[in-house]
Amino acid sequence: MERNTGWKRIVYLMCAIQVGAGIAMIGVMAFLPLFLGEIGVTAAGEAAFWAGLISGVTPFMIALSAPFWSIQADRRGPKLVMSIVLAAVTLIAFLCAVSTSPWQVFIFRLLQGLVGGFVPIGLSVIASVSPEEETSRTLGYFQAAMVSGIMFGPLVGGLVADTLGYRMPFVFCGVLSLICLICLRLFMPEIHRKGASGEKSSTWQELKYFAAISRVRLMVGIQFLCNFGITGIGPILPLYIKDMLGGGSEIIATIVGIIIFLAGGASALCSLSTGAVTARVSLPRLLTAATVFVGLTFIMQYMMTNVWGLGFFRAVTGIGMGFIMPVANTLIAQAVPNEKRSIV
């Protein structure tokens, strides 16, 4: 993409929109298993099954559809494609608010995943407009914005759910996503990659190209495993905490939101400091240390027998995750030609 002289403005705008979009997309995590009880899923085992299915289908479909949308963003411009994503998130949030069965919620979340891919497109925009020497720092900013959405989403969603009922967070998330869409349309400039109108490769050809790069394969694998570990407990976390508390608390969604908030806050702070740390420590060494650290904190989470011990070590895990993602993304960006960064 063209190196715009106003690249800082684009970076800050993308980060701000990512925070809002992240809250809108992740805000349901703190109360989703509890909401299922309101639409007829009463058994704990059945609620856990549906929570895992509904929570997992969206990122799964995003993983399948993201390469297609990234290539479309490269050809047609990221502004148009991100607008489609935000419009879909807005509509689906409102549809979930009036859903009456777990199957309806499942289908809506599946459709959201099909038009997903906001984060990789945002990453490609940041990597493309940032000067080479600023890439690590700006990707750290975007990672912090992404984590902030993950951090505030469940907290806000949990608070709204515990005070206004389990349907109102969907409405809140829909309105917030609509605001992000309006800001994107008003303030985001059109960005086109030089030569984008030339020879075009298919999605499969692009995937084969990146899969042939060993560093890209390694970094994608590390990101997948770390995200799998940190989010694997997400769908059942409210039920797990409810069991820890003996089912006696009326603010379970808020407690879940606080725990996720603490983990996200630690991750965001570390992401913001990535640029300063990588100026003193090599990227591979920092990535190795962070992954080992995260592995140890996962073991400590398993050993906890109370809610706040679990919350503490999930927050500590966020420290390592805050370094892993921007460092891995920087290494990926360095491994591909500049003209390919808008796709990878």
Regions found by a protein language model. Give the residues of each.
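Cytoplasmic helix-loop-helix junction between adjacent transmembrane helices
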Residues: 108-146
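Short amphipathic helix-loop junctions that connect adjacent transmembrane helices
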Residues: 31-48, 236-254
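Intracellular juxtamembrane helix-capping segments at the cytosolic ends
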Residues: 118-130, 323-336
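Paired small-residue
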Residues: 103-111, 308-316
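Conserved MFS/SLC helix-loop-helix module at the cytosolic interface between two early adjacent transmembrane helices
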Residues: 64-100, 278
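Juxtamembrane intracellular "pre-TM" segments in multi-pass secondary transporters
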Residues: 1-8, 190-221
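Structural signature of the two symmetry-related core transmembrane helices
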Residues: 80-95, 174, 285-299
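Central cavity-lining transmembrane alpha-helices of secondary-active solute carriers
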Residues: 53-69, 261-273
